[in-house]
Amino acid sequence: MTGVFDSLVADMHSTQIAASSTYHQHQQPPSGGGAGPGGNSSSSSSLHKPQESPTLPVSTATDSSYYTNQQHPAGGGGGGGSPYAHMGSYQYQASGLNNVPYSAKSSYDLGYTAAYTSYAPYGTSSSPANNEPEKEDLEPEIRIVNGKPKKVRKPRTIYSSFQLAALQRRFQKTQYLALPERAELAASLGLTQTQVKIWFQNRRSKFKKMWKSGEIPSEQHPGASASPPCASPPVSAPASWDFGVPQRMAGGGGPGSGGSGAGSSGSSPSSAASAFLGNYPWYHQTSGSASHLQATAPLLHPTQTPQPHHHHHHHGGGGAPVSAGTIF
């Protein structure tokens, strides 16, 4: 771009120098005495060349040839005043055209800046006023969303004695509530489901702590001891079953000791099964089988039948507890 601009400036400078040289050359012949209509026309055209170059610097040669060509058919010999008038009107029109867009542009710029400045104080002055209430509204929301201060300020739920008694009775039956049971219990006690759920959670954790510390034996809460003692009776129950099996095997070595071994092995599994099943009252079928085992165990002692037949009953009695144990 700079090279093109420099070339244009050099061309303009050369055309101005040529125009000034022709101006000096044409001004000398009229002083010598060769004045005619052609001389007037050439001098007038040469006089106006330097005036054309400032107004239209880039296309000076074309404009000068255009006006000189237009001058000869119109003016003829006495057309000396016509180019002055024509050029004056053109220059006036050009200056007017140049001034009109410039004035319009200046007014447009001024209007834009005025409008911008009129909006600027509104934007700067109103934005802090609008931001302050937003900050005030957001601060309580942040406190609410945090939740921790709200949880600290939340009051504790105070249960009545009737509600506590009903919850305790339900907890003794089962430690875990299904969704329909929890909804029914909450509606009957006038509590929310969340309050019932949290009470059961707290009660379970408290019961586990008390049971682990030994404050609550498992016999006092057979129904409520479903979850914590659930790990211990299976440990003790296989021990009783295993204890009965070696005793039975050891007792079965001699023909005379088979009866006593059968009696002891039949009684110990039945007692272990009854003790184990006592912790689970909802297993009605298994508790029935345990009572059946307790009923069949005493029948083995009085009926001292011959050894092979009694040995057959011994295997039958030993097979029944094993089949009951497979339920677990």
Curated annotation (Swiss-Prot):
It holds the Pfam family DLL_N. Residues 16-28, 52-72 have a biased composition (Polar residues). The keyword Transmembrane helix does not apply. It comes from the Eukaryota. Acts as a transcriptional activator. Activates transcription of CGA/alpha-GSU, via binding to the downstream activin regulatory element (DARE) in the gene promoter. Plays a role in terminal differentiation of interneurons, such as amacrine and bipolar cells in the developing retina. Likely to play a regulatory role in the development of the ventral forebrain. May play a role in craniofacial patterning and morphogenesis. Belongs to the distal-less homeobox family. This is Homeobox protein DLX-2. It comes from Homo sapiens (Human). The lineage of its organism: Eukaryota, Metazoa, Chordata, Craniata, Vertebrata.
